[in-house]
Swiss-Prot record:
Induction: Up-regulated by phagocytic stimuli. Belongs to the TrkH potassium transport family. One of its GO terms (biological process) is intracellular potassium ion homeostasis. Residues 199-227 form a coiled coil. May function as a potassium transporter. This is Putative potassium transport protein DDB_G0292412. Residues 110-129 have a biased composition (Acidic residues). The chain crosses the membrane at residues 48-68, 313-333, 353-373, 385-405, 443-463, 472-491, 505-525, 550-570, 571-591, 592-612.
Length: 648
């Protein structure tokens, strides 16, 4: 719909251009493909600015912001509807294991297995029945309450003396605590009042032990108070009797009194030590209770760790985009203003240098490949600074965005006063954000990207030695254009050399690179997806992607060949030219060798652009895209489902 509206606006401004061409260019800009059927260098500034807006709306980086906003909205809505899904500093898998308080624990199957055995209606009925107890168990159940349990995974330590089996030694920043409680259907409140919770039982045992110790202490104090009086009476009687005895007996009596006094002092010291130990134990117990009550804040989403982490992304991503735009615009514009040869090129094409800098900064960062010159960037193929700067903008806005985002988070976490949200993003990347990968997948993405670039440069140097496109160039300029072509061929679509002068072997190399243009990113995206069937399975990802990516272009090329059968028979165009343009559209690259197309073929190309853009997006089963998509057997998911049914 956005592409259609943009096309209508382009038609209203450039009314001489056919609507099908406006529609083609509008969707080409929105999908950041960059293919054009007419020369846009002569369009008005208003139309070009509209193209910049469409390009920005289709930006790979900008499209991640609505996902972040969606997840934050979901968290707020859940907290506002009920206070059952909450815990300050909770990790994304807040309740990962469901333990029913009256039923034996059992493992739940995945959604795919359930869908194979039961239809959707039966699954819904089973979801409702799972809340009810078995009548044969003869156990009392309150219809107003829903008893649930689970493992609460917190980011701060609560009790280091947890029972064995509940501690997670592999996660240094997370601590697992089993919880069991009830949810009131009417008030939607959750309470940890179930006696089956191990933590509650441990606290009750500690309280009983403290009460017993206090009773023993009171008994000891009473005995100590009675002991001096007894000792005095005994001493008086003994002294009266010993007055009639000899001096030796008197000395023995004095020795007895001394030993009793020493024993008394020892008992007092022992009691003091016991009281100090009890005081320390009480203080530790109170501190543990404070820590236990602090993270279990079930009524505030502002303390939720995932919510805080998403908030940091809402600041970092716009700052990332704006910073790159400013640096790219100023650097390119300043270079053009300071270079006489660059100014002469702009003047010859009737383009302002600063406007050229702004337009190409947006086009390069968003990998659109749209240019203000009719021959793309061929006129500046000897400008080292411009080509290198544009190439940096290209990979910062597409393939290497996850790499630099992870580096930024790592650096910020080292110097910020609040590092917990950043650490949460680094430790749980794909469960929170689509374009943030774990460390292993991030390194693999960067290594594969480097291998692709080096391989393309080497193959171009091997296959394109005597091509006319590189005549009158020195070795440094040739190597520069090899490098720029390796960066631009797979994503952006800028061309610094005339493609029609390249050999068919090099063009065939370009076809292969455009076809696999987004594979490094797609593989990292699918392998790192949370609760995905292709998680950590590169081979399965490649099979699924290749089957789909071969079938879709083949069908579209077949239809285009049917629509352009007359041009093929007359030799105006060739099958290879159709293949090159189709793969360029499907890969959202934008390289073109300028072929003539009919109206129906242009519509097929629009469908190819949209299909190519869709394959770079996460699947619908990705947890970081669909936060409400929890397992059907999860308690939270059931409660939300039943709540929606009541509203209906």
């Amino acid at each position: 719909m956005v592409g259609f509206i943009g096309s209508v606006l382009i038609k209203l401004i450039e009314f001489e251009v056919p609507f099908i061409d406006c529609l083609y260019i509008g969707y080409s800009a929105l999908t950041t493909t960059g293919l054009v059927t007419v020369d846009i260098s002569g369009w008005s500034s208003g139309t070009l600015f509209l193209l910049v807006i469409l390009v920005q709306l289709g930006s790979t980086v900008l499209l991640t912001l609505p996902i972040v906003l969606l997840r934050r909205f979901f968290i707020r809505s859940v907290y506002s509807n009920s206070s059952i899904i909450s815990a300050a500093n909770a990790s994304p898998d807040l309740i990962s294991t469901i333990i029913h308080s009256h039923l034996p624990h059992h493992d739940f199957k995945d959604d795919d297995d359930e869908n194979d055995n039961n239809n959707n209606e039966e699954n819904d009925d089973n979801d409702d029945e799972s809340y009810q107890h078995n009548n044969n168990n003869n156990e009392e159940h309150d219809d107003n309450d829903i008893e649930i349990g689970g493992i609460l995974k917190l980011d701060s330590p609560i009790d280091h003396n947890l029972p064995n089996g509940f501690q997670d030694d592999n996660a240094p920043h997370h601590y697992n605590i089993p919880i069991v409680g009830k949810i009131d259907k009417k008030s939607r409140k959750f309470s940890l009042d179930s006696p089956s919770s191990p933590i509650i039982q441990q606290q009750q045992q500690q309280q009983q032990q403290q009460q017993q110790q206090q009773q023993q202490q009171q008994q000891q104090q009473q005995q100590q108070q009675q002991q001096p009086s007894t000792t005095t009476t005994t001493t008086t009687t003994t002294n009266s009797t010993l007055n009639k005895s000899t001096n030796n007996s008197t000395n023995n009596n004095n020795n007895t009194n001394d030993s009793q006094s020493i024993q008394k002092e020892v008992n007092i010291d022992i009691n003091r030590i016991d009281s100090l130990q009890e005081l320390q134990e009480q203080q530790e117990h109170q501190q543990q209770q404070r820590q236990l009550s602090k993270p279990l804040n079930l009524n505030s989403y502002e303390d939720n760790m995932e919510y805080r982490s998403l908030g940091k992304l809402l600041v970092i991503i716009p700052c990332y985009i704006i910073t790159i735009y400013i640096l790219g615009f100023i650097s390119i514009g300043a270079y053009i203003a300071g270079s006489e040869s660059a100014r002469s090129i702009m003047k010859a094409n009737g383009v302002n240098g600063w406007w050229w800098s702004l337009f190409h900064t947006f086009s390069a960062f968003n990998n659109a490949g749209l240019a203000l010159f009719s021959d793309s960037l061929i006129q500046i193929n000897e400008k080292y600074f411009l080509l290198i700067t544009l190439s940096i903008l290209i990979f910062l806005g597409n393939t290497l965005f996850p790499v630099f985002l992870r580096i930024i988070l790592l650096v910020v976490s080292k110097f910020t006063k609040d590092p917990e949200p950043y650490r949460n993003l680094l430790e749980n990347p794909r469960s929170i954000f689509t374009h943030l990968f774990p460390y292993k997948e991030t390194v693999q993405l960067f290594v594969i990207w480097c291998i692709f670039n080096v391989s393309q440069i080497a193959l171009m140097a091997l296959l394109d030695v005597n091509d006319k496109a590189f005549t009158n160039m020195n070795y440094g300029t040739i190597l520069l254009n090899y490098y720029f072509s390796s960066i631009s061929t797979r994503t952006c679509g800028f061309n610094s050399v005339d493609l029609n002068l390249l050999s068919e072997s090099v063009l065939l190399l370009f076809v292969g690179l455009m076809f696999v243009s987004s594979y490094p990113f797609i593989i990292s995206l699918r392998r790192s997806a949370v609760n995905n069937k292709y998680s950590n399975q590169s081979r399965e990802v490649m099979k699924e992607v290749l089957i789909r990516d071969i079938f879709v272009p083949y069908i579209c090329i077949l239809f285009i060949a049917i629509f352009e059968s007359q041009l093929l028979e007359s030799g105006v165009i060739t099958v290879f030219q159709i293949l090159f343009e189709a793969i360029s559209a499907f890969g959202n690259v934008g390289l073109s060798i300028s072929i003539t197309l009919s109206t129906y073929s242009k519509l097929v190309f629009i469908a190819l652009m949209l299909a190519g853009k869709h394959r770079q997006l996460p699947e619908s089963v990705d947890e970081s895209v669909n936060p409400a998509l929890l397992k059907k057997n999860a308690v939270i998911s059931k409660i939300i489902t039943r709540y929606k049914r009541r509203k209906l």
